[in-house]
UniProtKB/Swiss-Prot annotation:
Record function comment: Transfers and isomerizes the ribose moiety from AdoMet to the 7-aminomethyl group of 7-deazaguanine (preQ1-tRNA) to give epoxyqueuosine (oQ-tRNA).
Official protein name in the record: S-adenosylmethionine:tRNA ribosyltransferase-isomerase
Entries under NCBIfam families matching the protein: PRK00147.1, queA
Molecular function in Gene Ontology: S-adenosylmethionine:tRNA ribosyltransferase-isomerase activity
EC number annotated for this UniProt entry: 2.4.99.17
Secretion signal span: none
Gene Ontology terms: biological process: queuosine biosynthetic process; tRNA wobble guanine modification
Keyword S-adenosyl-L-methionine: yes
Location within or outside the cell: Cytoplasm
InterPro entries registered for this protein in UniProt: QueA, QueA_dom1, QueA_dom2, QueA_sf
Swiss-Prot/TrEMBL catalytic activity: 7-aminomethyl-7-carbaguanosine(34) in tRNA + S-adenosyl-L-methionine = epoxyqueuosine(34) in tRNA + adenine + L-methionine + 2 H(+)
Domain of life, per lineage: Bacteria
Length: 366
């Protein structure tokens, strides 16, 4: 079997001190590993990004915003409970991951105190198990006409990834500066490096931006477990590629500009939209809905020319996605170099930009 299909081929050892616990300050002072071509990398800082972009290039951003999805409460008998909200089903019913799951029986009532200690407790009842996520369906007690969204900031906190042990960073540092649409349980971390000053500089250079939405879900962190990655069942995520973004993409392509996805979530949006449109056989169409697109080596690209991304966890579907762009052996060699040179990994870590010239040999559908 081709080595690209083995899960173990995407494993690597990462020393614990390479996992960033705090973000760079300012944001764009993180390091930037530039994959220039199939053989060459540069070592720069994120504020140098413009040196590798051309007038007419397009950066596509994910404007999702991390919601205060983690709530701490207790059962009626005083046992501590923690939940992570995943999906809104109705105005007052949500699917959530719960701890301790085995001790939260159906019908159990949980109260969540307000963060300020002044507002009344928020109550919820465990209705049923959700087999798809391993979580539970909860029904919250709200005022008539009220949604949980309305009160969530009073009771919830931003969920930081589990590999960030000592929470020294602020909530704002775990949001992109262009975050608008509340709904994610994790940040689209490739976008955390951008500052207003950098956007201004890039705009003056003739680099454009456009936005899509993908609310990052818990599926992003679920490990791939099948040794043959072709047996992996990819999680679904809701995406929105609006007409205005499709229009900018078409103009960029027509003028010879290059399309850079800022993060793997944007890759899923753009390639998912292109797949739904049957592009390039048919014109691009705006798309809003679910995608379960799984990108791994051998994938035939439709739209994305280049990628800005962070450094990802071993054996993750995100590592497979990036491997599909520049090949797995090349990516794993780059990761070895990054570790040796002290790059910081994961959500608050450094970034890499993969230029179109580095993607030669990764054929697009014609």
């Amino acid at each position: 079997m081709d080595q690209d299909k083995y899960l173990s081929s995407y494993d690597y050892h990462l020393p614990a001190d390479c996992i960033a616990q705090t973000p760079a300050v300012p944001r764009d002072h993180s390091r930037l590993l530039v994959v220039k071509d199939p053989f060459t990398v540069d070592h720069q800082h994120f504020y140098d990004l413009g040196n590798y972009l051309k007038p007419g290039d397009l950066l596509v951003l994910n404007d999702t915003k991390v919601m205060p999805a983690r709530l701490h409460g207790q059962k009626e008998n005083g046992v501590a409970v923690e939940i992570l909200l995943l999906t809104e089903c109705t105005e007052n019913q949500w699917i959530a991951l719960v701890k301790p799951g085995k001790r939260l029986k159906l019908g159990a009532k949980v109260k969540f105190p307000a963060r300020d200690g002044e507002k009344p407790d928020l109550w919820a009842t465990i209705l049923q198990r959700d087999d798809a996520t391993g979580g539970r369906l909860l029904e919250f007690v709200l005022e008539p006409g009220q949604r949980l969204w309305d009160v969530l900031p009073d009771y919830g906190e931003i969920p930081f990834p589990p590999y960030i042990g000592d929470r020294q960073a602020t909530n704002d540092q775990y949001q992109t500066i262009y975050a608008e649409k509340l709904g994610a349980v994790a940040a689209p971390t490739a976008g955390l490096h951008f500052t207003e000053e950098l956007f201004t500089k890039l705009a003056q250079q003739g680099v454009q931006t456009a936005k899509v939405t993908l609310h990052v879900g818990i599926g992003t962190f679920r490990p791939v477990e099948a040794e043959n990655i072709l047996d992996h069942v990819m999680h679904q995520e809701w995406i929105d590629v609006p007409p205005t973004t499709v229009e900018v993409i078409e103009k960029t392509r027509a003028s010879g500009g290059r399309i850079f996805a800022v993060g793997t979530t944007v890759v899923r949006c753009l390639e998912g939209m292109a797949q739904e449109s049957d592009f390039p056989r048919q014109p691009l169409q705006p798309f809003r809905g679910q995608t379960d697109l799984f990108i791994y080596p051998g994938y035939q690209w439709r739209l994305v020319d280049g990628l800005i991304t962070n450094f990802h966890l071993p054996k993750s579907s995100l590592l497979m996605l990036v491997s599909a762009l520049i090949s797995r052996p090349r990516l794993m060699a780059i990761y070895e170099t990054a570790i040796a040179k002290g790059y910081r990994f994961y959500s608050f870590g450094d970034a890499m930009v993969i230029l179109p010239e580095a993607c030669r040999g990764q054929e697009k559908i014609r």
